[in-house]
Amino acid sequence: MEYILVIFCFEDRAEDLKIPTFVPVSDLISLLGELFGTKGKALHAEPRGIILDKNKTLAEQGVEHGAILTLE
């Protein structure tokens, strides 16, 4: 199984996460909400500077190791 290592930033926290490459962003948003009690409808990726498509995975959208993800 392949993974992407990312930094998830929310409120005043940052967490290193190892995300399987096959997980769609919509599922990832739900999982992050459950794990960290966060709310958001979109996931933003830096340094790409894009709002991620909920129907695609991080890998399909070119998100690479070390990317910073934030909920919007």
How does the language model describe each region?
Residues 7-9, 35:
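Intrinsic disorder/low-structure terminal segments
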Residues 16-20:
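Generic structural detector for well-ordered beta-strands
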Residues 21-40:
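Short amphipathic, charge-patterned alpha-helical segments
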Residues 9-15, 41-60:
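Short acidic beta-strand-loop surface patches of small beta-rich interaction domains
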Residues 66-69:
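Loop/turn positions that initiate beta-strands
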Residues 1-6:
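Short structural boundary motif marking the start of a folded domain
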